[in-house]
Amino acid sequence: MAIEKKPAGARGSRGSRTVKTLPNGKPDPASLSDRQRRILEVIRDAVVLRGYPPSIREIGDAAGLQSTSSVAYQLKELEKKGFLRRDPNKPRAVDVRHLPETESRSSKAATQAKSKAPQAGAHDPELAGQTSFVPVVGKIAAGSPITAEQNIEEYYPLPAEIVGDGDLFMLQVVGESMRDAGILTGDWVVVRSQPVAEQGEFVAAMIDGEATVKEFHKDSSGIWLLPHNDTFAPIPAENAEIMGKVVSVMRKL
């Protein structure tokens, strides 16, 4: 077993536990449950095949875990046992440090696929550093505004050469007010957080607690958020809070 209780009288805090390691200093594979082994395989195979880790939901689906909190608990346990290393600043940045000696069928397939794949793209160390893990924070209205959901739902790995750098987040567009600008309902907009905008930039803005995406416009009559659909009227924006600048639009075909 990986976890051993200290005998009575041992030094340390009450209830403290020690993770068993092998003589060579590596974590003991015998400490892993079948589910934890499966989680390691899923993470490893995703990194090998596509160059970045799976999402919390993908791990849960593969390991038979219904809630994201259960997945988070298992990841913490694997980190404690020394099989994973996680970056606290990048929730999806997970590094499998030690693997059990036995290979699953899926991991063998992944290794074979890696050997046949061209050594470029996500496997290039320089390009690998250009991936941004962008949080999805809900839906944004483009038309009749709806309240934006401010909880992070997911993290998407996106090429930094497309979305750039900075504090980024993603929102899904709902409505047709930006149709003539090519931003359609169901599209995803990547937004760089910033409190100001330049003339003509597309922005995500909060108005009376509701969020919308529009073109920023300022003239002698005031500040406006302009739609790109003649059936919608400009919105006065003197009291609007600029959430950020839209830097990319993504669409599923």
UniProtKB/Swiss-Prot annotation:
Cysteines engaged in disulfide bonds, as pairs: none
InterPro entries with a match to the protein in the record: LexA (IPR006200), LexA-like (IPR039418), LexA/Signal_pep-like_sf (IPR036286), LexA_DNA-bd_dom (IPR006199), LexA_repressor (IPR050077), Peptidase_S24_LexA (IPR006197), Peptidase_S24_S26A/B/C (IPR015927), WH-like_DNA-bd_sf (IPR036388)
Signal peptide: none
Keyword presence, Lipid biosynthesis: no
Domain of life of the organism encoding this protein: Bacteria
Residue stretches of biased makeup (Basic and acidic residues): 82-106
Biased composition range(s): Low complexity: 107-120
Keyword Cytoplasm among record annotations: no
Residue ranges for the DNA-binding region feature of this UniProt entry: 56-76
E.C. number(s) listed in UniProt: 3.4.21.88
Site (Cleavage): A142, G143
SUPFAM superfamilies reported in the protein's UniProt record: LexA/Signal peptidase, Winged helix' DNA-binding domain
Catalytic activity: Hydrolysis of Ala-|-Gly bond in repressor LexA
Region feature Disordered, mapped onto this chain: 1-34, 82-127
GO biological process: DNA repair; DNA replication; negative regulation of DNA-templated transcription; proteolysis; SOS response
SUBUNIT field: Homodimer.
Role description: Represses a number of genes involved in the response to DNA damage (SOS response), including recA and lexA. In the presence of single-stranded DNA, RecA interacts with LexA causing an autocatalytic cleavage which disrupts the DNA-binding part of LexA, leading to derepression of the SOS regulon and eventually DNA repair.
Family, as annotated: Belongs to the peptidase S24 family.
HAMAP family on file: LexA
UniProt name for this protein: LexA repressor
Species assigned in the record: Corynebacterium glutamicum (strain R)
Lineage, top ranks: Bacteria, Bacillati, Actinomycetota, Actinomycetes, Mycobacteriales
Designated gene of the protein: lexA
